[in-house]
Amino acid sequence: MKKIFLAILFVASFIAFDASAQFRYGPTVGVDFTTLKFKQDLFTVDQSVGYQAGIQGEMMFPGIGFGIDIGAMYEQRGATLNLGEKKVWSSQGYGSHRSYLHYLSFPINLRFKWTRMNGLEDYIAPYVFGGPNISFMLAHSSIDALDYTTADLGLQVGLGFEVLKRWQIQASYNWGMTYCVKTKILDDHSAKNRTWSVRVVRFF
């Protein structure tokens, strides 16, 4: 994790001192489709739908298509856990429970945008991106069978289209790299976030 933070700091410092870089920002909203990937398949986990909203910034180097995007956003993740499928939990009265995970997330991505398409880029320009996503838990469901961690580190990749140089529509997948939830009864039964996202950004 230390290496990731150092890499982020290096990239941010490099861009901050480049006078030719173009920065803009705007609001973003989207939908999350999340599940929790446990170490062992002791019970089924159903994907749940959440939402996200926040601010996204973009800094691009003119002429070469490379840049960086950063964001600060609220995200609702989680999944439905069918704990009642195992006697160890059903005997305590547990059944199917929706586990809500509320995060403040800070994605930082390197991106490449196709900007030399003979004028077509003024109307539509595809782009790809990838980088770390650092999230801090704000709140969670009260499920006594679970323990929760305070922070989550993920890696995400995605693609999208810029429309009329103002709107961006993108889809991404986030791999949780650290465990966010674990069961209290079984010490080694923990889970990581797995999230598909669809998001719209409107830049000023």
Regions found by a protein language model. Give the residues of each.
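Short loop/turn motifs that connect adjacent beta-strands in outer-membrane beta-barrel proteins
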Residues: 19-23, 61-66, 115-125
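Residues that define the transmembrane beta-barrel architecture of outer-membrane proteins
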Residues: 21-23, 45-51, 100-106, 124, ...
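Transmembrane beta-strands of outer-membrane beta-barrel proteins
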Residues: 23-29, 51, 66-70, 106, ...
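Glycine- and aromatic-enriched membrane insertion/assembly motifs of diderm outer-membrane
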Residues: 24-26, 35-36, 42-96, 168, ...
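Transmembrane beta-strands of outer-membrane beta-barrel pores
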Residues: 31-35, 74-78, 112-114, 132-140, ...
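Outer-membrane beta-barrel "beta-signal"
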Residues: 32, 107, 190-204
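Outer-membrane beta-barrel translocator domains and adjoining extracellular loop/strand segments
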Residues: 37-43, 80-87, 121, 140-146, ...
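Outer-membrane beta-barrel proteins
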Residues: 58-63, 110-119, 163-165, 177, ...
